[in-house]
């Protein structure tokens, strides 16, 4: 599939020491069919040829753009923001021109080499057209009502269209999960499921104004909570199935495996990670969420420079095995860190004075966690005669790489290497963008240009890419064999900030993988797919680690802490700030031993006691206690909630507490009031039963014990 901007090759920086070559003339050269091609011709054909990915950048940009837009509107957005979000999504998923849904289908079909059946394709496209048309009508009605919220007619129209559209999503979602074709349909399912959940959220935001009853609003809310789990589990299951089906043994199979992993993360899993944050009862104000997962762009190596000479493609040139490449490229689960410096060591591949390639042979990476100590890792050859090149990246986001995949031929033995890389970066806190480049020199070799933005495009078009970039470089891996040196870049999402800043007027979600250290006994483990990154685990009591947080004033602002966790045991969570204890509470098991982590095994719980930060920068610590070794306790993230935020669950708890207290006399807390009847106690019991397990499980148990005591007193009195 051709790139839309294939002929718009952006040049390397002006300080480059390489002669510019016309990309148009090169394109013409590569289209010429040559007979009896020789050594020099093969090199000439591949010179500055642009490597085409499976899909245009605009297709991936759709997934990146939608996730990025939603990240900016989490919580309960203003009515105008909701309408604007629908307008954006309609433009992305139902644009004029070629059907975006077909492009999604074709992309996955090509990666996994599986065609969707004609019936399933046509059924899905027909249902998607209907949903798009209905969503556009609802969007127009919503905008009309937002412009005149007191208009009875506008309110009635948007309400009826909302109910009809929501039911339509319920009916049509199964068309995107056809048995046997779940994997190629997965991006479509994820986007449609995401829209359904956003739509269900509207009932909680606007339902009261539209005239929906409390029970109707509750029905939509409960459906949203239930479907969020169902949709999440479906996406993770079929992502994992598709990925495992692509696992192979050689380098070529790794290429498609990695492409599926990257693109399905961008188009599916990033959306799934946001589903819990659509809950308006949990997130009634602006909410900041972060994606900490890593994705990997294609290896920098020549690909098909000539069809009759297959070994000139890096993965056919005696490249390492699938498992060796994974080990070289994908780090073990680790705390989120940021790249600070790269030192590059070069090797020389030489045929003659006019044909040679100085290429990337090894490197030393320096990186650190947020507020942590410097870490160093090395790969490849680091003891070479060529002077190393050191590139500083402290406090800089590398948002784009332009790399040359080089090919040097020794008679019939190709050598694959990387003779040049341009790292485009910007300072995090200043509007200054520039680049550093690695270029030790080469001559007479074949090269192909690989631009990271073809695989990780910016979130939006129409802005400079140093403003709208979606990812930052986090790590570099090296695939190394006797005749292959291929780089693989690792990237994190821009939403994972460098500062762990807590805002006074919004809910701040901080994944625990952003801690700056790990306590003894704690481990980072692979995320289950729906958390947006890796998670932390303990199997015995102790602290997980420390998070360095920065506080935006006012410092008088008070917060409550919430924890998203999963556990095979009842336990206590303890929190502290700068070593001073803040909260301690009992919480219950969410899963059984041996059970897989899925959406329902995670629960978000909170402490009721508020606190303030006294310093601009503080260290927050969380630990798990009072459980037997051998159990498993996982934490996804910590949430800091301004205390002014009131919750329906909190109101219900206070009301239930008052009703329970009212059963007893004021002079004797153990004495039942004389006018309390059996049905009074039953009413209070039902009220306690309706309390949220998520927030007040232990308090609920305590109130039940008091109600039972009241029941016992009533029975004894009647006897």
Curated annotation (Swiss-Prot):
The keyword Heme belongs to this UniProt entry's keyword annotation: no
Organism superkingdom: Bacteria
GO biological process: sporulation resulting in formation of a cellular spore; symbiont-mediated killing of host cell
Annotated Pfam families: Endotoxin_C, Endotoxin_M, Endotoxin_N
Keywords of this entry: Sporulation, Toxin, Virulence
Function: Promotes colloidosmotic lysis by binding to the midgut epithelial cells of certain coleopteran and lepidopteran species. Active on Plutella xylostella and Bombyx mori.
Protein name: Pesticidal crystal protein Cry1Ia
Primary gene name: cry1Ia
């Amino acid at each position: 599939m051709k790139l839309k901007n294939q002929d718009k090759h952006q040049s390397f920086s002006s300080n480059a020491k390489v002669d510019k070559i016309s990309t148009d003339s090169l394109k013409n050269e590569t289209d010429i069919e040559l007979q009896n091609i020789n050594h020099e011709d093969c090199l000439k054909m591949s010179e500055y040829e642009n490597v085409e990915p499976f899909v245009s950048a605009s297709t991936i940009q759709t997934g990146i753009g939608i996730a990025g837009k939603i990240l900016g509107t989490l919580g309960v957005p203003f009515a105008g923001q909701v309408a604007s979000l629908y307008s954006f999504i309609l433009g992305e998923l139902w644009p004029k021109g070629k059907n975006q849904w077909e492009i999604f289908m074709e992309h996955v079909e090509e990666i996994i080499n599986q065609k969707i059946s004609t019936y399933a394709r046509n059924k899905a496209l027909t249902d998607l057209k209907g949903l798009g048309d209905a969503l556009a009508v609802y969007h127009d009605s919503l905008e009309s009502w937002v412009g005149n919220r007191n208009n009875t007619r506008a309110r009635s129209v948007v309400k009826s269209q909302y109910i009809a559209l929501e039911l339509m999503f319920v009916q049509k979602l199964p068309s995107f999960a056809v048995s046997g074709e779940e994997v190629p349909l997965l991006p479509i399912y994820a986007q449609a499921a995401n829209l359904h959940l956003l739509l269900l959220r509207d009932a909680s935001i606007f339902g009261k104004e539209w005239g929906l009853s409390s029970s109707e609003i509750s029905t939509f809310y409960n459906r949203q909570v239930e479907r969020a789990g169902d949709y999440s589990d479906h996406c993770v299951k079929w992502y994992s199935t598709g990925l495992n089906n692509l696992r192979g043994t050689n380098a070529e199979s790794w290429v498609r495996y990695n492409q599926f992993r990257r693109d399905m993360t961008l188009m599916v899993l990033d959306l799934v990670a946001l589903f819990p944050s659509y809950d308006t009862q949990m997130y009634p104000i602006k909410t900041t969420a972060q994606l900490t997962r890593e994705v990997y762009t294609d290896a920098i190596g020549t690909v098909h420079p000539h069809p009759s000479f297959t070994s000139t493609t890096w993965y056919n040139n005696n490249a390492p095995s699938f498992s060796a490449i994974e080990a070289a490229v994908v780090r073990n689960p680790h705390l989120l860190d940021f790249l600070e410096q790269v030192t590059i060591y070069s090797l020389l591949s030489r045929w003659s004075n006019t044909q040679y390639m100085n290429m990337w042979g090894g490197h030393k990476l320096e990186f650190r966690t947020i507020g942590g100590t410097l870490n160093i890792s090395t790969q490849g050859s680091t003891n070479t005669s060529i002077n190393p090149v050191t590139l500083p990246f402290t406090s800089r986001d590398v948002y784009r790489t332009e790399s040359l995949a080089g090919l040097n031929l020794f008679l019939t033995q190709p050598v694959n290497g990387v003779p040049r890389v341009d790292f485009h970066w910007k300072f995090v806190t200043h509007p200054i963008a520039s680049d550093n480049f690695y270029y030790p020199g080469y001559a007479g070799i074949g090269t192909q240009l690989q631009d990271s933005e073809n695989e990780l495009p910016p979130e939006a078009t129409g802005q400079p890419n140093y403003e709208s970039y979606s990812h930052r470089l986090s790590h570099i891996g090296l695939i190394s064999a006797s005749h292959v040196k291929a780089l693989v870049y690792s990237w994190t999402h821009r939403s994972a900030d460098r500062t762990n800043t807590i805002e006074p007027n919004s809910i701040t979600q901080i994944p625990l993988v952003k801690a700056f250290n790990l306590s003894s006994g704690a481990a980072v483990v692979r995320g289950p797919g729906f958390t947006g990154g890796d998670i932390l685990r303990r199997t015995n009591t102790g602290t997980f680690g420390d998070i360095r947080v920065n506080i935006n004033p006012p410092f008088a602002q008070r917060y409550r802490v919430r924890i998203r966790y999963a556990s095979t045991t009842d336990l206590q969570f303890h929190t502290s700030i700068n070593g001073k204890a803040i909260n301690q509470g009992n919480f219950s098991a969410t899963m059984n031993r041996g059970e897989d982590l899925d959406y329902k095994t995670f629960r978000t719980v909170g402490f009721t006691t508020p606190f303030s930060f006294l310093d601009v920068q503080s260290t927050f610590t969380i630990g798990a206690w009072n459980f037997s070794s051998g159990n498993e306790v996982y934490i996804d993230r910590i949430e800091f909630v301004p205390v002014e935020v009131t919750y329906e669950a909190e109101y219900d708890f206070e009301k239930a507490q008052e009703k329970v207290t009212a059963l007893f006399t004021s002079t004797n807390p153990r004495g039942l009031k004389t006018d309390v009847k059996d049905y009074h106690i039953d009413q209070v019991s039902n009220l306690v039963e309706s309390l949220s397990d998520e927030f007040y499980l232990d308090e609920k148990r305590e109130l039940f014990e008091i109600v039972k005591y009241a029941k016992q007193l009533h029975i004894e009195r009647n006897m």
